[in-house]
Amino acid sequence: MNIDRKFKFLAVNPVNGHIYTDEDALVLCAKDKAVPVALEAYQKECVRLGANPEHIESIGKLIQRVKEYQSSVKSEVPDTVGGEIARCINGEGL
């Protein structure tokens, strides 16, 4: 199943070597204005679920890095436009 229909990607965890793609993961662009709030909600849910403290802390540091990045670039309202619409909503071209 294509979880992320907007992006094709291959990501490798440099510590454990696990590989992730658009089949089992998703991408949030750091420039998107909604990302800090989305990460804060994720962090809160991780706390509720009992994730280990290091994971909670790493999310907090990620939120700070995203905010710092956004302060140095033109952050934008996220969008899905043009040909992305048919792919993201209807799964065309998968």
Predicted regions and their residues:
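Short intrinsically disordered terminal tails
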Residues: M1, S71-L94
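N-terminal acidic leader/helix
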Residues: M1-V35
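Residue-identity detector for glycine
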Residues: G17, G50, G60, G82-G83, ...
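Amphipathic alpha-helical packing elements
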Residues: A25-S71
